[in-house]
Amino acid sequence: MAPNYAKKCPVMGKAPSSGHSSIGPQDVHTLEVLSNFNREKIPERVVHALGAGAYGEFEVTHDISDICNIDMLLGVGKKTSLVTRFSTTGLERGSSEGVQDLKGMATKLFTSDGEWDWVFLNFPFFFIRDPVKFPDMIHSQRRDPQTNRLNPNNFWEFVTENHESIHMVLLQYSDFGRMFTWRTLSSYSGHAFKWVMPDGSFKYVHFFLSSDRGPNFKDGAGTIMDSSEPDFASRDLFEAIERGDHPSWTANVQVIDPKDAPHLGFNILDVTKHWNLGTYPQGVEKIPSRPFGKLTLNRNVKDYFSEVEQLAFSPSHLVPGIEASEDPILQARLFAYPDAQRYRLGRTLSKQASPRTSSTAEYQASLGKDFAEWVAQVSSDVWSQPHEDDYKFAREYYEILPEFRSQEFQDRMVERIVESVSQTRQDIRNKVYRTFALVSSELATRVQEGVEGAEIGQEKNVQARL
């Protein structure tokens, strides 16, 4: 017997059109088969379209009850089931997982208080701090609407007109921006969140997952991908779990008292900056982290479409004890993610009612004028404009690389930038040189000499063939 898609009664075989001379309303089974086929696929995600996923669990490993009132995180040894989806960002399904861009690691935790989504990226900061720029930023990294090919002119024009993105660009073009495997990917919330106590007091937190295996690059070896296998990371993840080699991540949290937030030397609500773990920049207070749990993936999915492709993540999926901060990019994501899922999955998308925590408004009012003025910065006219910190963070990242990693690590970053900028128009190149000069004269010179030197070399090769 063949299945009946209406789930009302079985159908004897798949006889052609049930013996009728034409397909009409009476031929219910054929119409159901065709209508089901027409609906097998759904629109792909507008970002993070290419992905892989697996099931697992989260276990609390350290007591953090002094700063946290989230039930899932209270009690060492408490376990919570979860599903995680890894993804690239800009390109479509079918593209290579090794593309040099942001990678996503989104986790849905099935807590006793509801679903809590951790929508993380593999970098601790982002390109922009003004959400109105997000569509232009994504479009600049996608295929050109005329040629349907990647166009470096679009990307570098965006960078040179939005200097807050330089910090992120340098990280993306380094080995950190290359794919290793999903199992060695660390990921970060990026945004500040609020962990709220029963009395309404709160701490600003940034939490992240450190891979217990990675990063696994050494002298660039880990950045070499087999272009003939675009899904190499998905295969690696699936096969590792199948053989019992379960990948795991340590969950860590950085904590800031709101009274201290206005005096840190940078604004933690600016997602183009990272919370200093002690590496860089100088003059910015170190914000140490503390571990609190372990995430382990231990079971593969059976049906990718229903179990991974139809997952709907959003940073608005919260549980009691956590609230979103005033970060403008985070605030925009609270709307954009559910809206994108409604478009992608339709009206049948289950509506998740996120329980509200106790209000922090009264507590915030008690923090005084300095705090109020600090929060108000995110809605000021100058928030979106470039300022010295945009160049400072990028400059110190560039300068610390030889010590933090190696000279070769820094060299490879410059080489990749040169390779990309070499594919742009001369007017764009000149803007790139001027932009990098605001960060480091050495960096600007290396990029310019690399690009123009390659151009001269190509011209000589052409002349030699004539």
UniProtKB/Swiss-Prot annotation:
Residue span of region Disordered: 1-22
UniProt-listed Pfam families: Catalase (PF00199)
Residues annotated as signal peptide: none
The protein's required cofactors: heme
Protein name from the UniProt record: Catalase ifgD
Stored PANTHER family: CATALASE
Binding residues annotated for heme, in chain numbering: Y337
Keywords, sorted A to Z: Alkaloid metabolism, Heme, Hydrogen peroxide, Iron, Metal-binding, Oxidoreductase, Peroxidase
Molecular-function GO terms, alphabetical: catalase activity; heme binding; metal ion binding
Pathway annotation from the record: Alkaloid biosynthesis; ergot alkaloid biosynthesis
Source domain of life: Eukaryota
Keyword Ligase among record annotations: no
Active-site residue numbers: H48
EC class (word): oxidoreductase
UniProt-listed GO biological process terms: hydrogen peroxide catabolic process; indole alkaloid biosynthetic process; response to hydrogen peroxide
GO cellular component, one term: peroxisome
Similarity comment text for this entry: Belongs to the catalase family.
